Amino acid sequence: MFEISDIFIEEKSVLKEGKELLITDTDKPVISFQLQSDRRETSLRSACIRVNNWIAEVKEQIGIKYEGEPLKPFTRYDVEIEAVDDRGNNSTKCAEFMTGRKRLPWSGKWITDEMHVTEKPNSPRPLYFRRKIHLEKAVEESWIVVTAVGIFD
């Protein structure tokens, strides 16, 4: 058995089950992959990494810098890696990642409530922020990325 057991973009796994889609703003993300074999001392002979039209033939697993066309903001990218070991066994795995805002200017409206929020330890009432929107077309895809200072520390 010889297989690619994980793929990493910017040192973060993109294959582990239950993981959210990885989002990066890096112009040239670093790609790595992990191999697994039931044979001792198995080594990588070569690998081919594809990200859209960019193809890299490599002999290493770690720190391969994407050198293709500039990545566009808010775009999904497929990654395919084919690895061959020292005995000619091969394994192929696919994954995806997405780019974030990158350097686009930010515009939007805050979703907030009318109350002035004061911090209370162990506040029993969670805050809800909602806004109704009306769309002219059907939604094809949507995602939300949320963060705030101190929430995830």
Annotate each language-model stretch with its function:
Residues 25, 36-51:
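Solvent-exposed loop/turn segments flanking beta-strands in beta-repeat/beta-sandwich domains
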Residues 86-101:
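Extracellular fibronectin type III
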Residues 136-153:
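Aromatic-lined ligand-binding clefts that engage carbohydrates, nucleic acids, or primary amines
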Residues 1-24:
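Short, compositionally biased P/S/T/A/G/V-rich stretches that sit at domain boundaries
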Residues 68-76:
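Surface-exposed, short loops/turns at beta-strand junctions within beta-sandwich domains
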